[in-house]
Amino acid sequence: MYKALIFTVLLVSAVAPVRSLDPPLNDDVLGLIVFKADLRDPEQKLASWNEDDYTPCSWNGVKCHPRTNRVTELNLDGFSLSGRIGRGLLQLQFLHKLSLSNNNLTGIINPNMLLSLVNLKVVDLSSNGLSGSLPDEFFRQCGSLRVLSLAKNKLTGKIPVSISSCSSLAALNLSSNGFSGSMPLGIWSLNTLRSLDLSRNELEGEFPEKIDRLNNLRALDLSRNRLSGPIPSEIGSCMLLKTIDLSENSLSGSLPNTFQQLSLCYSLNLGKNALEGEVPKWIGEMRSLETLDLSMNKFSGQVPDSIGNLLALKVLNFSGNGLIGSLPVSTANCINLLALDLSGNSLTGKLPMWLFQDGSRDVSALKNDNSTGGIKKIQVLDLSHNAFSGEIGAGLGDLRDLEGLHLSRNSLTGPIPSTIGELKHLSVLDVSHNQLNGMIPRETGGAVSLEELRLENNLLEGNIPSSIKNCSSLRSLILSHNKLLGSIPPELAKLTRLEEVDLSFNELAGTLPKQLANLGYLHTFNISHNHLFGELPAGGIFNGLSPSSVSGNPGICGAVVNKSCPAISPKPIVLNPNATFDPYNGEIVPPGAGHKRILLSISSLIAISAAAAIVVGVIAITVLNLRVRASTVSRSAVPLTFSGGDDFSRSPTTDSNSGKLVMFSGEPDFSTGTHALLNKDCELGRGGFGAVYRTVIRDGYPVAIKKLTVSSLVKSQDEFEREVKKLGKLRHSNLVKLEGYYWTTSLQLLIYEFLSGGSLYKQLHEAPGGNSSLSWNDRFNIILGTAKCLAYLHQSNIIHYNIKSSNVLLDSSGEPKVGDYGLARLLPMLDRYVLSSKIQSALGYMAPEFACRTVKITEKCDVYGFGVLVLEVVTGKKPVEYMEDDVVVLCDMVREALEDGRADECIDPRLQGKFPVEEAVAVIKLGLICTSQVPSSRPHMGEAVNILRMIRCPSGSSDELGSS
């Protein structure tokens, strides 16, 4: 019996340790599972949390003590969790760190959290949607707490006075909530605090004097509250302070001189208060300062000369005060300045020349020579709303890092320096409301990062420089109230990001470029009080433009001003290219005749009659000959005959042999009947939509005429003319220009500019001796130019459908121009069978979706054709080549070579190795990406342009490549 009792005791004592370990482990698992049940986990970040697990130590976001296996840390930052913080956490008795920041948690914070979890040292619940108030006893047992962040929530009420119990607290962040009332005095007894952030709340009352107790404080942020009264001088006792932000309160009085004791302070922000007095000279003793912001206060007097002692200063903001006098020359000593803002004061004197000089001499030299200075690192310079005079120094171009230049509302004179074009990072230039004169320098286009250009209310004259087209990021262009002359440059339409344009109150003349209607982001457009005339562009912002935006231009017409435009008919064909056509009386007026009638003598009339008789005879004989030959000989040329006089100018006649010819330029048209023939001897080539002939107009000016062979499919005359006129408005440096068109019911012609360089196909595959003269740089520029053109077409909602090397033409200087664009718009419906039959000559270029009726045809079919073209240009091979017993598809061949690491072997051997291999291989990879079988996997053409620019200029500078 006794032995059995001893055995039982030993057994219980042996099992007891095991039983003592099991329940706590189960408590941790149970607590976390209960906590998870209150959450929504859209990204399945808590999928590893399994209630059947013996221990949670391997769960995502959970960390345990290595010896006891108890949960000590729970870190679920940024898990996209939503729901509430449930009671399950209270089971984690050994938890040291709880971090749930950057989620979408809502509800209240459990008032017993800190009471139950007495081992907590770090609590971070910031950046959630927690609400409610904290009860007074919330902090009653927080002696172990070292870090507490409840920032960026929706907490309200007063900060509990029990905060004083957190005797070990080193960092307290309650910012960006709705806490109100005064700051509890208990905070100022936490002498372990290193960081205190109560900013962006609704705290009120005076700044406590007991701040001197926080002698370990390094960072203090009480900004954006309602604090009032003076800044206590006791703040100088916190000698370890490095950052102080008391901005956006209602603090008053002068700066306490104890600030100068804060030798470690590198950031002092007191902006947007009611502080007054002079900026003290002792400010120069705070030599560690990198940021000094006293803006939007009531400071007066001059900027102290001691400011030059702050050699580490990076940001100096004294804006919005009542400072007077000139800018001290010692400021030039602050060679590390990145931002200088003195706007909104009453500073006077000439604009210091040292501001715009990249000098290196010290202040002693500056006192004798104001032409040098040292703030060459400056990024933002704002001296606006002062009374500075003088000129902007030419040394402005030395400030290569400048991003914002604000000199508006001063009394500056002289020209805008041409060196403005050297500021490649400049995004804002505002020199408005001054007395600047001269012209807008054409070098302005060199500031390629410009987003905002404000030059209004000056005395500027001359033209708006077309080089402004290079500022492709420009959003705001304000040039009003100047003396600008000339016309509005059509290049403005290339600034596709423009949102605001104001050219009012100038001397501009001419018509408005129609392309401005394509600016999709434009919401403000003002051209009032100029000398502009003609019809307003149709579409875009111009459909809802306010009449006041165009007032003061008597010649403007259109629906906006409720004034119809005079119907000026197309000019008829005349033999004298120097003559003009009077649209009001239908007469041809020779040069120098003005509006006078020409009186013909009798001998002249006889001569004209005789000539007319001869012409009639010749025509009669010609007609007879043609009738005889018509049955046996096919025509070798198609004569173009036109209705004469007023009939031509209005509409085609009912005679099928008469037609309507319109030249968009308005210039006189065909010079002789012979040149108006589509002679087969002058045929340049044939495609799916018709043949192309070369002919001459306007005293030997060559053009290319495409005779459409889809007459049975072409739309009606009205639809045809409407679509062709849209195509005629397209303008791009890499687009073949459409000069005009000709229409009859049986014959339709499109008249293009003639390009002497021939097609890319001939340059690649039909060069004499098989030796193409295209260098690698030529080929890269052709690829880039083609890409930019297609991007422009897609931006204009036009799909090419037929991109291939024979449709890429070269001008005399080798620049590529894309032709045959928009022809599919002339078909009555974009039927894929019709399209595929018309572009069947583009074998190898056709995107695979043409063969699948369930896939929508988009601009990605052009991307596919472009990709094939890229590979063709780089390799010099045709898209499809037929061998004796095989067919080689270029895309497949190159893709296989790339996978085998032999991409460089595909490059055209005619280049003889004279090309950068890495660049060529990168271009090949782009071509293969563009030829993806899945349309959505192909890039947009705009993306392709950017990729090409990055390939050529990896550093990010694409100046040498131009802009689209």
Curated annotation (Swiss-Prot):
GO function terms (MF aspect): ATP binding; protein serine kinase activity; protein serine/threonine kinase activity
GO biological process terms held by the UniProt record: regulation of cell division; root development
Glycosylation (residues): 104, 173, 317, 370, 470, 526, 562, 578
Residue ranges of domain Protein kinase in the record: 678-951
InterPro entries with a match to the protein in the record: At_inactive_RLKs, Kinase-like_dom_sf, Leu-rich_rpt, Leu-rich_rpt_typical-subtyp, LRR_dom_sf, LRR_N_plant-typ, LRR_R13L4/SHOC2-like, Prot_kinase_dom
Its membrane topology: Single-pass type I membrane protein
Keywords (A to Z) from UniProt: ATP-binding, Cell membrane, Glycoprotein, Kinase, Leucine-rich repeat, Membrane, Nucleotide-binding, Receptor, Repeat, Signal, Transferase, Transmembrane, Transmembrane helix
PANTHER family: OS05G0588300 PROTEIN, RECEPTOR PROTEIN KINASE-LIKE PROTEIN ZAR1
Subunit structure: Interacts with IRKI.
Protein name as it appears in the record: Probable LRR receptor-like serine/threonine-protein kinase IRK
